[in-house]
A protein has these predicted regions:
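Glycine-rich beta-strand-centered segment in the early N-terminal region that forms part
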Residues: 5-21, 31-93
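NAD(P)H dinucleotide-binding glycine-rich loop of Rossmann-like/cofactor-binding domains
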Residues: 52-53, 64-67, 76, 86-166
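Conserved beta-strand elements of the Class I
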Residues: 13, 169-170
Length: 171
């Protein structure tokens, strides 16, 4: 099973997937290829994930992000997450091991937002944001999925802090 195959080890975190958000370039390419036929888009996305073990569009190279619930945390994970945390990943799905268990059956293939069930694995170098209980998945996707900006801000701030300098961040 996907759960057994994706047991968290060492510095990994296993996440129960609730929703994928395909990046705009990937979705547009698939939509155009299949002339808006949602069933064909859904079948291709499911096929990409099944064959590659991640959502990495073979034409655009891009993926997206996901929202899920932490199922298991490896004993050496540096991510600061706990089982039960609702999270959004801030690294591309093109870099995230992923198994889908529902065939994306609840998705009509006509938008970037994909209801899904499955399992993903985050590594020690992954970036994930714990989501507040009062933040809807839809709003979280809109706020968090801005071309990797949250991950870039985190990295830049850490570089400044590591050098003993106070960063200035404008939001």
């Amino acid at each position: 099973s996907a759960e057994r195959r994706f047991a968290a080890i060492s510095n990994e975190v296993r996440v129960r997937v609730r929703r994928l958000n395909l990046d705009a370039a990937s979705f547009q390419q698939l939509h155009d290829k299949h002339v808006g036929d949602g069933a064909r888009v859904r079948a291709e996305v499911a096929g990409i994930i099944a064959s590659r073990g991640k959502m990495q569009n073979p034409v655009t190279g891009s993926g997206g992000m996901l929202i899920g619930t932490v199922a298991e945390v490896g004993p050496q994970s540096p991510l600061g997450l706990s089982a039960g945390d609702r999270v959004a990943t801030l690294v591309s799905l093109s870099l995230t091991p992923l198994v889908i268990t529902d065939g994306l059956e609840r998705w009509d293939g006509r938008s970037e937002r994909v209801p899904a069930a499955g399992t993903a694995v985050l590594f020690g170098r992954s970036i994930a944001a714990r989501l507040p209980d009062d933040l809807s998945p839809e709003l979280a996707l809109m706020v968090m999925d801005v071309c990797g900006a949250p991950a870039l801000v985190t990295r830049v701030v850490q570089e400044y802090a590591g050098a003993g300098r106070a960063p200035t961040v404008a939001v």
